[in-house]
Amino acid sequence: MFSEQAAQRAHTLLAPPSASNATFARVPVATYTNSSQPFRLGERSFNRQYAHIYATRLIQMRPFLVSRAQQHWGSRVEVKKLCELQPGEQCCVVGTLFKAMSLQPSILREISEEHNLVPQPPRSKYIHPDDELVLEDELQRIKLKGTIDVSKLVTGTVLAVLGSAKDDGRFQVEDHCFADLAPQKPVPPLDTDRFVLLVSGLGLGGGGGESLLGTQLLVDVVTGQLGDEGEQCSAAHVSRVILAGNLLSHNTQSRDSINKAKYLTKKTQAASVEAVKMLDEILLQLSASVPVDVMPGEFDPTNYTLPQQPLHPCMFPLATAYSTLQLVTNPYQATIDGVRFLGTSGQNVSDIFRYSSMEDHLEILEWTLRVRHISPTAPDTLGCYPFYKTDPFIFPECPHVYFCGNTPSFGSKIIRGPEDQVVLLVAVPDFSSTQTACLVNLRSLACQPISFAGFGAEQEDLEGLGLGP
């Protein structure tokens, strides 16, 4: 793929200089459409309750679940509301899950004077064998028992369950199903290889020299400043770069200055200022050569709740001179040469990881596709805007490439849906710790990691042998 193209011209590296230098034109993007408008906030009113988003989520998802239930269990299955249940009568119920978790952090429990509890330390997982599932619809709620994986499911998931109500007031689940993958448009054929580079977690301002070296190597490769003619020819096939959040390091979050009185910090400079200047210079180099989409992340200077709004252009006075720089939302969706991309900076996957037994980030990505919702745990354990007319996190259309950023390691796989949908799942690793980015081939939907690691591992080996400084 990418490396094979570079190998075809590798012999030119040690060749004598020629009178004329080879030039490689950047592969143009035939069509591009930014489809992230549903994630743009027209108003910012936080006076509403979050019950509205759960209600509209259930209203939007119910037709998909009823249709899928009838396909799964037959058209004769009876779909009822919770208020219509009769003990012992088998039926199907569609509702929203609530997961009662004993280990889930609660600020009300921690500040309660009568409990006087010490705040529990952060955990990697908050699941417990005693967790229970409760199904809610518009009018009632009922506890679930039976053949359903309590540890895997999370609050906010809309699903259909088949079973019957029992005399003890619980619903005995015999089977359950999700809405599954949304409809998908076919990918138009491409005659040449074109690549989209996915990068996340640059972590600028963290103070790591190894990370800065890898970042500059990344920029030099993409802009054609590094390598022989073969590598430069391959770099010309990168039609777009997507930066998936956490452009700044978590070290730039100066909690100490936030907690201090303003008169004590009046003459101090925020730690993120230099990091933003550095980011502006990097974006300047990239956008001068290739279109760049910049998504915000957890540690970046924008709103914390999902959907995160684009970074303000005033922070990038150098890079915004180029029209190729595009500041976008998180989540972000776009169609590039007929291939529909949808991705996040990773907060939704990390939150599901904490409140579910699922361990693999690719498994969580696939699961969110199956339940047809980007972030079911929002707004329960992940902050989001209190929408009330529509839930923008529901998949209206199945993407061809679905990615999440800032994962511990790289991973990719292709899954298929019941209606011949084909989706490439990509876990984009945190660049500051792995020095790895991802290349997606738009023609074949193949994905490969590309590493920009310097001499960190070699230096550690030398020190282990007693040869290092």
Curated annotation (Swiss-Prot):
Keywords assigned by UniProt? Acetylation, DNA damage, DNA excision, DNA repair, DNA replication, Nucleus, Phosphoprotein
Listed GO CC annotations: delta DNA polymerase complex; nucleoplasm; zeta DNA polymerase complex
> Can you say where in the cell this protein is located?
Nucleus
Query: InterPro entries, from UniProt?
Result: DNA_pol_a/d/e_bsu, DNA_pol_D_N, DNA_pol_delta/II_ssu, PolD2_C
Modified-residue entries (Phosphoserine), positions: S257
As stated in the Swiss-Prot or TrEMBL entry, residues carrying the post-translational modification N-acetylmethionine are M1
Main localization, broad class = nucleus
Q: Which GO terms describe its molecular function?
A: DNA binding
Q: Gene3D superfamilies attached here? A: 3.60.21.50
State the source organism's domain of life. Answer: Eukaryota
* One biological process term in Gene Ontology: DNA-templated DNA replication
Subunit-level organization = Component of both the DNA polymerase delta and DNA polymerase zeta complexes. Component of the tetrameric DNA polymerase delta complex (Pol-delta4), which consists of POLD1/p125, POLD2/p50, POLD3/p66/p68 and POLD4/p12, with POLD1 bearing DNA polymerase and 3' to 5' proofreading exonuclease activities. Within Pol-delta4, directly interacts with POLD1, POLD3 and POLD4. Following stress caused by DNA damaging agents or by replication stress, POLD4 is degraded and Pol-delta4 is converted into a trimeric form of the complex (Pol-delta3), which consists of POLD1, POLD2 and POLD3.
Similarity section: Belongs to the DNA polymerase delta/II small subunit family.
Q: Which PANTHER family match?
A: DNA POLYMERASE DELTA SUBUNIT 2
Role: Accessory component of both the DNA polymerase delta complex and the DNA polymerase zeta complex. As a component of the trimeric and tetrameric DNA polymerase delta complexes (Pol-delta3 and Pol-delta4, respectively), plays a role in high fidelity genome replication, including in lagging strand synthesis, and repair. Pol-delta3 and Pol-delta4 are characterized by the absence or the presence of POLD4. They exhibit differences in catalytic activity. Most notably, Pol-delta3 shows higher proofreading activity than Pol-delta4.
> What protein am I looking at?
DNA polymerase delta subunit 2
Species whose genome carries this gene: Mus musculus
GN (gene name): Pold2
